[in-house]
Amino acid sequence: MLTWLQRNSLTFPPLEKAMRDPNGLLAAGGDLSADRLIQAYRHGCFPWFSEGQPILWWSPDPRTVLFPDELHVSRSLGKLMRKQRYRVTFDQDFDAVIRACAAPREYADGTWITEAMQDAYIELHRRGFAHSVEVWDEGELVGGLYGLAMGQLFFGESMFSRADNASKYGFATLVQHLREAGFVLIDCQMPTDHLHSLGARAISRQTFADYLARHLDQPNHATWVC
């Protein structure tokens, strides 16, 4: 039975209570307050829903992740990076990145990054949890992504691209930055061909929970202004 969250409580049900079909649906309801979102990521779940649906919280099994040392850079992407085809910054325009990620896609009917979701993550950015990666081509924002950094873990949320390999360029740059800063895992949530091409793979929900327990409260050395 699906658990409905109460607005006056930040408690989530145990991860093993998540449904098998649909895979990983853990709870519904609650709100998108910054405190609840922080608790959700610490617990091992994330919000994902469409306009008109209640807030849905997920913890899929298996979980798609990328270990920084396993980043795969294709020949074409490596060529672009060696040429420094784009300029990459961090936290220079979080609002623009999340708006671009929320924009309609040709292959989708709508967006799960609702206005309420955008406002929630902008607040997390103000609090220092959410960060953006911007990819620039001569002053034009052509790609980027955003997510949360907590301890030695980074929780990726969404990315966009308006130019050849721009989102992969930004993601690869981020992974290199995180590796140097002592991060051990990047949560990619759900599997996609795009992420698998970069080296992402599946681990069990329990293994993911073990990483949370060991690394959420460990220090990292990341700087986010460049």
From Swiss-Prot:
It is found in: Cytoplasm. GO terms for molecular function: leucyl-tRNA--protein transferase activity. Signal peptide: none annotated. It catalyses: N-terminal L-lysyl-[protein] + L-leucyl-tRNA(Leu) = N-terminal L-leucyl-L-lysyl-[protein] + tRNA(Leu) + H(+); N-terminal L-arginyl-[protein] + L-leucyl-tRNA(Leu) = N-terminal L-leucyl-L-arginyl-[protein] + tRNA(Leu) + H(+); L-phenylalanyl-tRNA(Phe) + an N-terminal L-alpha-aminoacyl-[protein] = an N-terminal L-phenylalanyl-L-alpha-aminoacyl-[protein] + tRNA(Phe). Its EC number is 2.3.2.6. It comes from the Bacteria. It holds the Pfam family Leu_Phe_trans. HAMAP family: Leu_Phe_trans. Belongs to the L/F-transferase family. NCBIfam families: aat. This is Leucyl/phenylalanyl-tRNA--protein transferase. It comes from Pseudomonas fluorescens (strain Pf0-1).
